[in-house]
């Protein structure tokens, strides 16, 4: 089963003679449980593709399905909720909030969604990652 699928994904910036096409009708699908690397030269559209697939930016054309939801048709509010619940992006340079401790930075998406964290699961995850002594 495809966990992620995009069809005819196009992203352009600018207009008229200054228009740049960053992605030109890209289609792909990823199966649940698969691992995929996106590689290419600088300026080849890797970051643009990942931003679109993660719902950080909107395509000029095409559709993006995560599970059975076409995220390219969601309102900004619906997309924000969907991203908090279903999408995780790890950037090359992490973007932690310096006024929050490690625990709160990790739990932030759950707290923003109004959910109560599963403390036992969180503690196990922190221990697995070797972060238990850095949480506060």
Indicate residue ranges for each PLM-predicted region.
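Conserved ABC ATPase "signature" region
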Residues: 69-70, 117-134
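Helix-to-loop junction immediately C-terminal to a conserved catalytic motif
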Residues: 54
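Conserved ABC transporter NBD signature motif
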Residues: 62-70
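A short, flexible loop at the N-terminus of ABC-type nucleotide-binding domains that lies
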Residues: 1-6, 12-25
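ABC-type ATPase nucleotide-binding domains, specifically the catalytic core motifs of the NBD
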Residues: 14-16, 107-119, 128
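Short coil-to-helix segment of the ABC ATPase nucleotide-binding domain corresponding to the Q-loop/switch region
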Residues: 98-109
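ABC ATPase NBD coupling module
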Residues: 17-20, 71-88
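The feature captures the beta-strand-to-loop junction immediately N-terminal to the Walker
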Residues: 39-41
């Amino acid at each position: 089963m495809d966990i992620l699928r995009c069809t005819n994904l196009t992203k352009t910036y600018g207009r008229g003679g200054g228009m740049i096409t960053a992605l030109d009708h890209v289609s792909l699908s990823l199966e649940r449980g698969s691992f995929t690397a996106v590689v290419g030269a600088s300026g080849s559209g890797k970051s643009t593709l990942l931003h679109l697939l993660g719902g950080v930016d909107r395509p000029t054309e095409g559709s993006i399905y995560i599970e059975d939801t076409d995220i390219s048709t969601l309102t900004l509010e619906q997309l924000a909720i969907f991203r908090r619940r279903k999408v995780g992006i790890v950037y090359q340079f992490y973007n932690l909030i310096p006024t929050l401790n490690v625990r709160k930075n990790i739990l932030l998406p759950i707290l923003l969604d109004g959910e109560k964290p599963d403390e036992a699961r969180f503690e196990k995850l922190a221990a697995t990652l070797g972060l238990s002594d850095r949480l506060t």
